[in-house]
């Protein structure tokens, strides 16, 4: 299986994020989405992780199934939340034993009190643990607007620089302006970090949903983007069309700016990503 760090060394990557299904209906949806997106030949795919025993089982099942039954390169997410250190070691060891080569190490979002146990405080500690247990291709998260729990942007950038010195690449939270990415990249370069920072892409198919997700990550959708989407009125098809246009333009701008990779947050649906691929003229796109 390919290592993402090696793929990035050879050129731009295009990748997709999925979340593990909670029931049979979601499982069938994910299966259809993977079947729809596999012909686009993504560089890799990632599978999210919430934290705790159930999430551990679900994420592991999906990534191992992808590894065994498809030609895709899967990367599990892993968070510090809800696991003592020895359990995190068991999970990482299980990933390696299954043949996985890539890991996305995250601090993790707060969980309900009964699941909130957290022995490792920072993603950087998880990166170090992953290294010791055999992972040579590890990514971390980056927030263009700053992590919601960071006291200020300066400390956020310093913490990100520390993480990226330990890791191999970063994937950003979603954003909507190429300037936001360029600012982050330049700030990291000023701190001596030139490792790849992949851009997270979230197509707007519902403004309310995206604004809610953005708020959870401490980000606000830019006003001009909001106005552009809202100009679609109550016409859902028009709103969706405008959202795809916004995402396509952002991807073009990022590619022109030399972004090392685009990582699409699919929400387990394929259509928006396939449309953006087609708009960009990327191979394998279409229905």
Please provide the spans of the model-predicted regions.
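Active-site-adjacent beta->alpha loops and helix N-cap segments on the catalytic face
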Residues: 1-5, 25-28, 53-65, 84-91, ...
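Active-site beta-loop-alpha junctions enriched in small/polar residues
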Residues: 18-21, 48-52, 77-83, 108-110, ...
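N-terminal amphipathic alpha-helix/helix-capping segment at the start of soluble metabolic enzymes
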Residues: 1-16, 23, 28, 284-287
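Catalytic domains of carbohydrate-active enzymes, especially glycoside hydrolases
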Residues: 33-48
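Conserved, mostly hydrophobic/aromatic
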Residues: 17, 45, 95, 163-166, ...
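Short, acidic/polar
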Residues: 24-37, 59, 85-93, 151-162, ...
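Active-site mouth loops of central-metabolism enzymes
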Residues: 13-29, 74-86, 139-155, 230-245
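Active-site pocket-lining/capping segments in soluble small-molecule metabolic enzymes
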Residues: 3, 118-144, 149, 191-244, ...
């Amino acid at each position: 299986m390919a290592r993402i760090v090696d793929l990035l060394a050879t050129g731009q990557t295009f990748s997709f994020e999925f979340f593990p299904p909670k029931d049979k209906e979601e499982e069938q949806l994910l299966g259809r989405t993977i079947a729809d997106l596999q012909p686009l030949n993504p560089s890799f795919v990632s599978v999210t992780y919430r934290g705790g025993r159930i999430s551990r089982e679900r994420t592991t099942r999906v990534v191992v199934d992808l590894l065994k039954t498809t030609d895709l390169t899967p990367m599990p997410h892993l968070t510090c939340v809800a696991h003592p250190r020895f359990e995190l070691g068991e999970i990482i060891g299980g990933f390696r034993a299954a043949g996985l080569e890539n890991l996305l190490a995250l601090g993790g979002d707060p969980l309900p009190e009964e699941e909130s146990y957290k022995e490792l405080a920072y993603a950087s500690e998880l990166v170090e643990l992953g290294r010791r247990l055999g992972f040579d291709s590890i990514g971390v998260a980056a927030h263009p607007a700053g992590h919601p729990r960071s006291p200020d942007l300066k400390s956020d950038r310093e913490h990100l620089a520390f993480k990226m010195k330990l890791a191999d690449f970063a994937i950003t939270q979603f954003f909507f302006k190429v300037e936001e990415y360029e600012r982050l990249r330049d700030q990291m370069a000023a701190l001596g970090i030139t490792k790849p920072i992949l851009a997270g892409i979230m197509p707007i198919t519902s403004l309310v949903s995206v604004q809610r997700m953005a708020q959870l990550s401490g980000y606000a959708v830019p006003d001009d983007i909001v106005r552009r989407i809202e100009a679609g009125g109550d016409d859902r098809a028009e709103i969706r069309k405008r959202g795809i246009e916004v995402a396509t333009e952002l991807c073009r701008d990022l590619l022109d700016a030399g972004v090392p990779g685009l990582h699409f947050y699919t929400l387990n649906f394929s259509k928006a990503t396939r449309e953006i691929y087609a708009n960009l003229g990327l191979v394998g796109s279409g229905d």
